[in-house]
């Protein structure tokens, strides 16, 4: 029996080995879609098992266990970098090189190759289990006190159904900005809910789909006021009752616009100068007071001054909406709607305004349109005002914002509904009122007399002494000055917490009552003239999903409409849609990281501070810089911060005249938009036929502006996906003419471990942690854009007015720039993601990631070059980590545009590559190191198949205007309609490739009509009656 079993096993092994050999002999890629064996790795687990078993059968003597076999099995790089060593060699050979290293040597210029990178602390990389233990250790060093600091940040309950099914769900957090509307209808609906929530609560008809934080939203509103008045008035007033971080950000931002910011008490505001473009007030004020701004706003308008109001969404469930008071623009944060404080972020901010100023709004806006069948569909509206189109003339440099957090806040409103939100608001207000009444009974301190919502202002003889007593009881209060404390309440506060506060403020005296005993005596303290009477959140969506089952199903319904990395690769060029590993994501929702106030004493955040120091050191090693600021909370914010640091450096040397920024025409639109925000004059330089910066044109521009040259903005590798051989010469030209080199870190995924911005010659660079370092894109945010600088720029890194910060490591001297973001360390809660990625990958893992990203791009380019022209390659015929295929010829031969190819890719189950940038009429493809060879082949096969579909049009076999590409994508509603008038079959429309039979992602709408949507702009949920009218009108 035993002998028969062995013989059977040997027969099976022999067949497996034979099959694997046959599969390897057929390895060379083919454009045919009907060879499924090609999608199986030549070294599949079965093959490995067969080889190992064969060896064990052929070995008759016992073997000792090697030390290597006893090492931990949960190493991370092999889980992140998809291509196996054998696949790497075969892919390199297919590209014409003997090995991966030979390909890299031919691709990355030797003049900029750096020595092997050696990371501090994590050179060898931690395993996943070691990393979790390390993060738990860091978390244990953070002390979560009960926070009453307020200032725009509050404790909140994150409903578990939202925590698990949205924040912790890769189907929600792994998508990019919804550029392909047909496969983004779920989060587009949720973002429309967010916009509706904002417009309802603020009383203004237009809202964007999130901004970075409240402080930067206020700065954007200030810029709007300047633009509305066409820059004719150059003073912006800020009431002293605004949050200090907001005031500081506006002051920093104003420098670039040549605006004068004046902070003044409300009672002292006047407009006699005739030079005031706008005024910012807080409602409720930073110290809690509620003021009636009605007459104030009328007076401002009488003098031609625009009014910006920073407000609190929860307060607006009880207060008269700012729009009804006459405010022109309303800004604020949605953080307390179910988003953790996270030591400062990420949180979704908002900006609402009137229809009159809609084209001057910053950020993404979601609007309603129709699809190809006339059915309502959503998409991003009014994109022509954004930076990727208008460049330096854009309303803002903002692109990535906070979509994931906006979705959380929107779902919080959906879950609670209007009545639930009112109840929470009334409860918070009642607790604050109870506390105020109790303090008056105690008589140990003086309580403010002005009306308040959630924040009680207390006058005392020694604020620090009271705060120290509170700290000993794990309570944080806000010290305003030596004699003033504020106490801000939130939805997590209980009556027992109020009793604890009474003990603190009793100053050693007994407390003869309880909060519960006096709560029933407390009345609504909001004046009748400021009490909200207008209903809000009346749409059915906000009144339907109030049980967990219902919200769970609603969340699942929406996520099912969106293609994410759960389904397939997202090959967007310049976006780096790589793996967001589970171990990296886990610490984000741990309470010890999530529930700390950004202005808590730093000793309570020792774990965070240790991580910041280590992360700063790691990033310095990776980039070749001397210091880092972690404050910028998006790539665009990093660009702006880096240029402002350069500006501050020139100013410190007396070079006030240096304001010229040279930018290649191929640069991303944020570059000129950011430079314009810093008050720089932009000089554009062209590129040559190979996609490189025209060095002679650059030299002439630099020399012509040598007395005024501030900076060059350059992306490396270039936006054309090429390592420019002359990058070191380019940096030298700028330095020789008195300028600084700003490197856009968008393509850092092709530098790590191979070269670095500092080694190349850059003076400052921002890193997109949401690209190279694995923070998920969240469907349009969050992001992080920390900036690294050389030593001479380190003194000018951003600081903060509440918690002083600067470079990491700290420079010898400091002349810091003002605040760039509302929180001292930006969106600190997501920094553990990048930290764990770097620590687990180690030096070699990170270097291998860069190499494999380059290999994957070259492999795909080689596969596609027979079917599509590949633009721009380096001197040895290779590309960097991304490449561009040229579709321009198809417009003449087949009437096909890049959009047609992108929409047809949806039918194949893929998100389209980046369209028509940096070259119009092209697609830019970036595969990343995280995609397997099988997935790369599947995408290539889809594009090759589409090329055959184009060929059928070119041959005249298919109508040029009515074909499968022009009709794409094909949702089930279209395919199952009674009438089918297309000249191709329903089956061909739906199943153009064999792999789709086993698993297919279905779009839920036909091609969306962007022009119709912009001409009939609707950016909120319509009431049911209006939806019926709209449907009838489109029909």
Curated annotation (Swiss-Prot):
<comment type="subunit">
    <text>Homodimer. The glycine cleavage system is composed of four proteins: P, T, L and H.</text>
</comment>
<keyword id="KW-0560">Oxidoreductase</keyword>
<protein>
    <recommendedName>
        <fullName>Glycine dehydrogenase (decarboxylating), mitochondrial</fullName>
        <ecNumber>1.4.4.2</ecNumber>
    </recommendedName>
</protein>
<dbReference type="InterPro" id="IPR049316">
    <property type="entry name" value="GDC-P_C"/>
</dbReference>
<dbReference type="GO" id="GO:0016594">
    <property type="term" value="F:glycine binding"/>
</dbReference>
<keyword id="KW-0496">Mitochondrion</keyword>
<dbReference type="Pfam" id="PF21478">
    <property type="entry name" value="GcvP2_C"/>
</dbReference>
<dbReference type="InterPro" id="IPR015424">
    <property type="entry name" value="PyrdxlP-dep_Trfase"/>
</dbReference>
<dbReference type="InterPro" id="IPR049315">
    <property type="entry name" value="GDC-P_N"/>
</dbReference>
<comment type="function">
    <text>The glycine cleavage system catalyzes the degradation of glycine. The P protein binds the alpha-amino group of glycine through its pyridoxal phosphate cofactor; CO(2) is released and the remaining methylamine moiety is then transferred to the lipoamide cofactor of the H protein.</text>
</comment>
<dbReference type="InterPro" id="IPR020581">
    <property type="entry name" value="GDC_P"/>
</dbReference>
<feature type="modified residue" description="N6-(pyridoxal phosphate)lysine">
    <location>
        <position position="771"/>
    </location>
</feature>
<keyword id="KW-0809">Transit peptide</keyword>
<dbReference type="GO" id="GO:0004375">
    <property type="term" value="F:glycine dehydrogenase (decarboxylating) activity"/>
</dbReference>
<dbReference type="GO" id="GO:0019464">
    <property type="term" value="P:glycine decarboxylation via glycine cleavage system"/>
</dbReference>
<dbReference type="GO" id="GO:0005960">
    <property type="term" value="C:glycine cleavage complex"/>
</dbReference>
<dbReference type="InterPro" id="IPR003437">
    <property type="entry name" value="GcvP"/>
</dbReference>
<keyword id="KW-0663">Pyridoxal phosphate</keyword>
<feature type="transit peptide" description="Mitochondrion">
    <location>
        <begin position="1"/>
        <end position="64"/>
    </location>
</feature>
<dbReference type="Pfam" id="PF02347">
    <property type="entry name" value="GDC-P"/>
</dbReference>
<dbReference type="GO" id="GO:0005739">
    <property type="term" value="C:mitochondrion"/>
</dbReference>
<dbReference type="InterPro" id="IPR015422">
    <property type="entry name" value="PyrdxlP-dep_Trfase_small"/>
</dbReference>
<dbReference type="GO" id="GO:0030170">
    <property type="term" value="F:pyridoxal phosphate binding"/>
</dbReference>
<comment type="similarity">
    <text>Belongs to the GcvP family.</text>
</comment>
<dbReference type="InterPro" id="IPR015421">
    <property type="entry name" value="PyrdxlP-dep_Trfase_major"/>
</dbReference>
